[in-house]
């Protein structure tokens, strides 16, 4: 680790010119590093203290001028490529997380946490703060007899999928395999198997976190059950998760389904609403709406059946004879293929903006809005299929309250030209606000920064979450998330 001074033209340039050794790699005892506090004010941190932190780590500490910094600070959403943390603590063990948390708390330093770096609103990074990076902590172990899987906090969903399917087992994971397990799980965990197996949090048996006080705390139904309740949907508000233990289910890694296309219109959406009401929980049916080869909007439907293939062929047969059906077929295929199928298209570095919310019922009025805006073609939209096992748990049984949701509906811009960002973000928002009367809360993993909405999103569970925040993070050290403020 080179104890170099943090310099950032837009955040710290004004004071950087007054600090000794700025950008020079100085190791003088009196040199300082410029950083940002939790309230946004400027901090000066002694380089010697940063050096002591670096020496305490099994992993690595990167400052802006260090070789490897650019790669270490990288996050998924290219809209936040210009963010420059003062330091990246790339942890190699749980004690590294403890040391980083203690260092940040003692100095009131802004903290972000990165596992896969997939935070859509860029909460995995910051300007001038400390990024605590868990990406090198990704060991995964399966106990096939107990039907459980243990994963380090920096594990990616692909690590979990691969380990579980090797034993013909599975737990619910998401739709892009390079997503971090930590943020995915703590926010709820919506995926292709959730209708049959439940959300990720419904399969979470235990978690270990490092709290704001630097304590290592395990939470389960039997240990710290209040914290365990909050971790299941409360996001990263209470600490940094360094380990998860999940329940596994028997699973055939060869599933049934395929990709089908349909003429996009009101009739298709009414058909989709009917499919939701009638399909067994083994079926996961997720349409997206965008331009076809002729430029007209079509529905592209991803179908996954996690169960007996013959039963799936029979149940899904109506999808192949609908009047609006255009192309595609249903057949057995490797679950791994669909779980990794979007990894390239949704790779790192693109410009991405998304707003989403849950829908309890696809009403005629909601259908009219979707038809209007999807046909405009300015931005894409899609459904994640829910219900089934996700709805069999009481609203207050976990922090995640959205048990009545039939769908998660997303509206997204994804591209490579930053010059389009302003117009595309405006188009997403216009579509979203038109849909808002038909929505019922949002998935915190796809949240915006609206504090009022975060408060309302948890409903009757919110006061209990505030109590947990007061207990485990009274200074709101962990604030770069769907934040629950202490009170």
PLM regions and their residue ranges:
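Soluble FAD-dependent oxygen oxidases
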Residues: 2-487
């Amino acid at each position: 680790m080179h104890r170099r001074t943090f310099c950032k033209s837009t955040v710290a340039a004004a004071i950087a010119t007054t600090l000794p050794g700025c950008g020079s790699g100085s190791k003088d005892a009196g040199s300082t590093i410029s950083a940002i506090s939790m309230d946004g004010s400027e901090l000066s941190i002694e380089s010697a203290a940063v050096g002591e932190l670096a020496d305490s780590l099994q992993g690595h500490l990167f400052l802006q001028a260090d070789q490897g910094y650019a790669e270490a600070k990288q996050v998924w959403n290219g809209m936040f490529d210009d963010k420059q943390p003062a330091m990246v603590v790339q942890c190699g063990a749980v004690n590294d997380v403890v040391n980083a948390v203690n260092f940040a708390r003692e100095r009131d330093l802004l903290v972000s946490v990165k596992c896969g770096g997939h935070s859509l609103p860029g909460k995995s990074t910051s300007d001038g703060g400390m990024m605590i990076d868990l990406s090198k902590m990704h060991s995964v172990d399966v106990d096939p007899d107990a039907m459980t899987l243990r994963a380090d906090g920096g594990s990616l969903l692909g690590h979990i999928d691969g380990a579980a399917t090797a034993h013909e087992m599975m737990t619910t994971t998401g739709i892009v395999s390079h997503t971090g397990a930590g943020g995915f799980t703590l926010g709820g965990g919506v995926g292709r198997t959730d209708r049959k197996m439940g959300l990720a949090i419904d399969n979470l048996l235990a978690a270990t976190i490092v709290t704001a006080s630097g304590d290592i705390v395990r939470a389960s139904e039997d240990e710290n059950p209040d914290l365990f309740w909050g971790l299941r949907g409360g996001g990263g508000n209470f600490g940094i998760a360094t380990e998860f233990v999940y329940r596994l289910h028997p699973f055939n890694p060869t599933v049934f389904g395929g990709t089908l296309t349909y003429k996009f219109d009101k009739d298709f959406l009414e058909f989709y609403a009917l499919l939701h009401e009638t399909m067994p929980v083994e079926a996961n049916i997720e349409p997206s709406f965008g331009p076809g080869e002729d430029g007209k909007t079509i529905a592209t439907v991803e179908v996954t059946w996690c169960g007996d293939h013959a039963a799936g062929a029979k149940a899904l047969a109506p999808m192949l004879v609908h009047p609006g059906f255009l192309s595609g077929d249903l057949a057995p295929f490797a679950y791994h293929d669909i779980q990794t199928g979007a990894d390239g298209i949704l790779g790192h570095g693109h410009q991405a903006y998304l707003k989403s919310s849950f829908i309890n019922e696809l009403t005629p009025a909601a259908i009219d809005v979707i038809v209007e805006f999807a046909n405009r073609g300015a931005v894409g939209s899609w459904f994640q299929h829910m219900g089934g096992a996700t709805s069999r748990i009481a609203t207050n049984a976990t922090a995640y309250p959205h048990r009545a949701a039939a769908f998660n509906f997303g509206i997204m811009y994804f591209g490579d030209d930053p010059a389009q960002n302003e117009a595309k973000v405006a188009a997403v928002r216009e579509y979203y606000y038109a849909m808002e009367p038909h929505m019922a809360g949002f998935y915190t993993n796809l949240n915006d920064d609206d504090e009022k909405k975060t408060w309302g999103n948890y409903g009757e569970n919110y006061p209990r979450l505030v109590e947990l925040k007061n207990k485990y993070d009274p200074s709101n050290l962990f604030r770069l998330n769907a934040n629950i403020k202490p009170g």
